[in-house]
Amino acid sequence: MAESGGSSGGAGGGGAFGAGPGPERPNSTADKNGALKCTFSAPSHSTSLLQGLATLRAQGQLLDVVLTINREAFPAHKVVLAACSDYFRAMFTGGMREASQDVIELKGVSARGLRHIIDFAYSAEVTLDLDCVQDVLGAAVFLQMLPVVELCEEFLKAAMSVETCLNIGQMATTFSLASLRESVDAFTFRHFLQIAEEEDFLRLPLERLVFFLQSNRLQSCAEIDLFRAAVRWLQHDPARRPRASHVLCHIRFPLMQSSELVDSVQTLDIMVEDVLCRQYLLEAFNYQVLPFRQHEMQSPRTAVRSDVPSLVTFGGTPYTDSDRSVSSKVYQLPEPGARHFRELTEMEVGCSHTCVAVLDNFVYVAGGQHLQYRSGEGAVDACYRYDPHLNRWLRLQAMQESRIQFQLNVLCGMVYATGGRNRAGSLASVERYCPRRNEWGYACSLKRRTWGHAGAASGGRLYISGGYGISVEDKKALHCYDPVADQWEFKAPMSEPRVLHAMVGAGGRIYALGGRMDHVDRCFDVLAVEYYVPETDQWTSVSPMRAGQSEAGCCLLERKIYIVGGYNWRLNNVTGIVQVYNTDTDEWERDLHFPESFAGIACAPVLLPRAGTRR
C-alpha cells in the first residue's frame, strides 16, 4: 500500500514501483488546497506475505513457539497461529500461561490433524483424503479454524457414496456439522436400500435407523424391502431383539402386497413372538380385508411415504364433433414447481367431466360421461376410489342418479354430490356417500335445479356458486350448506355471473375462477377472479386470468391454484394451457402446458409414493 501527497507526487507514483504485478488504478481525491492523495493496492501482497512466512518457517527463522503432540514437534510463529485460529488467539493474547511458553503440549488433537492445520495457516491450502479427513476435521473444530472446517465439509460432501455415507454421517454427528448432516440425510433417503446392504449399516445407531424408517422422504423403497433391511439390522445383534417393535412400528405393513405379508412377513419368528409385532401384522390384514373401512383405520403406518403433493388429473375430452372419445389417462405433475406432466396410470373406463374429491389421500371419482355428448344424455352414475400407493382402483356403490357437470366435495368425512344434469334434465338433488357403509343417500336438495356450477368446502360447510339455474341471477348465486342442520341458505352473490367455472378454498378464502358468460347466442370467457370470505360474507376481486378457461380442472397445490385445460371461447376451441395463480402474491405465474388439449378434466392434489415405490 502506498500513499503520495502533493500534486506532483501523485503524477509520478505509478512509475516508482519495481518489477512484479503492477498496482491497481489509484483512488484519487483532492483536498481543499488542491493537493492530490492516491491510495494504491497490490493484489499480490497477501500471497507474497504467505509465501514469505512459509519461507521463514521452512528456514527455521523467527520461530517463537513449538507445539508438541506425543513427542512430535511443530515449530511455528505465534502471530501466524493467532491470526488464523480463535483458539490460539485466546491462548497467546488472553493472559494464559502458555503465552509465555516456548514449548506447548497440545491435547485433544492428533499429530496428523495439527500438521495439516499448520500447513494451511502458512499456505491457505489443505490436502484431504478419506484416510486423514477425520483427523483434520477434528483438529479444525478443536482449534476453531472455520475455513478448514468448511473445506472438510466440502470434501466430504463430494466424497459421499453408498460406501462412505454412514461414516460421514457419524463425523457430522460427532462434530455437530448441521449442513453436512443434512447432506448425509438427503443422500441416505435417496439410496437407503443400497446403503442397507453395507456392513456399516449394521453398526448404525438405533435412533438413526428409526429416524430413516419413520421418514416420508425415503425414495424408491418398497415397504417389504424396508422390512428386510430392518430385520437384517435386528438380527445382527441378539441384544437388539427386545427393541424389535420399536423399530418395526415404522414399517408400513398395511401398504404391502397381501402376498408379501403372507409369504415374507408372518413367516418370521420375530413377527409372531413379539406381541406388538403381531398387532402390526393384524392391523395390516384388517386394513386390506376391509377396504371400505380403511378411513377408520388411518395411522402413521397407512400413510403414503411422501411429503410433497402432486397434481393428478383424470380423463378429459378433445371436444370435437367428429370425435366423441374420452380419455382414460391419469397424468401427474410430480411436485409444485415441476414444468412437465407425465402419465401415472389409467382409469378403468375413459371419462370426461367426471368429478373428483380426496379423503384421507384416497381419490373418489364419480359421474361424468363415457362418450362425449354436448348435453347430459351421456351422464353416468359410476363411482370409483383410487388408491395411490398400490395404484389400485376399487369400484364403489353407484350414485342414486347419473350426473354430469355437478360437484363432488368432501365434508365431515362424507362425500357430497350436488346438482348437475342427466338425460332427464337438470338436478337439484344432493347425495351423500358414507365410506364405511359404501352407500349413497340423499341429503337436503339445493333450493333450485343447478348444473355447470362450482363448489368448495371451507370451515365445515359446503359452498356452491353460479351455474345454470332458472334465472340470470342464479349464475351469480352462492349457496351454503350446513351439514349439522342439513339445510341450504343463500349467501352474498358473486360480482360476476359465471357457469362451468371453478372454485377452490385457500387460506380461509374461497376463490371463483374462469368459466363463461352467455349473451344472446354467444359465449364469452370470464377472466375476472374473486374470492369470498365466509366470516364477512363478502367478495373481493383480484388479478384476472390471462386467458379464458371453462370446463377446466382446478385444484390447490401449496397455496397456488392450478387451472388445467378446458375450453377457450375467444379461440372457440379446447386448450392445453395450465394457468397458475399465487394466492400469496396475487400474481399469475408462468403458464404450463398439459400434454393434451382437453376439456372436462378433473384434478386433485394427491400424495403419491416417491419414485420407484409404486408396483
UniProtKB/Swiss-Prot annotation:
One protein family per Pfam:
BTB
Q: Which residues form the BACK domain?
A: 165-266
Explain what the record says happens when changing residue 208 to C.
Answer: Found in patients with Ebstein's anomaly and left ventricular non-compaction; uncertain significance
In terms of SMART domains, this protein maps to: BACK, BTB, Kelch
Record keywords: DNA-binding included? no
Q: Which domain of life is it from?
A: Eukaryota
Region Disordered, annotated ranges: 1-35
Q: Which residues carry this modification: N-acetylalanine?
A: 2
Keywords in alphabetical order: Acetylation, Kelch repeat, Repeat
Task: Answer whether the UniProt record assigns the keyword Lipid biosynthesis to this protein.
Answer: no
Q: Which SUPFAM superfamilies match?
A: Kelch motif, POZ domain
Q: Where are the Kelch repeats?
A: 310-361, 362-413, 414-460, 461-508, 510-559, 561-608
Could you tell me where the Gly residues compositional bias lies?
1-21
| Ranges where the BTB domain occurs | 63-130
Its biological purpose: May play a role in endo(sarco)plasmic reticulum (ER/SR) mitochondrial signaling. May be part of the ubiquitin-proteasome system (UPS) and affect ubiquitination and degradation of target substrates in cardiomyocytes.
Which disease is reported for it?
A: Defects in KLHL26 may be cause of autosomal dominant inheritance of Ebstein's anomaly and left ventricular non-compaction.
Q: What is this protein called?
A: Kelch-like protein 26
The organism of origin for this protein: Homo sapiens
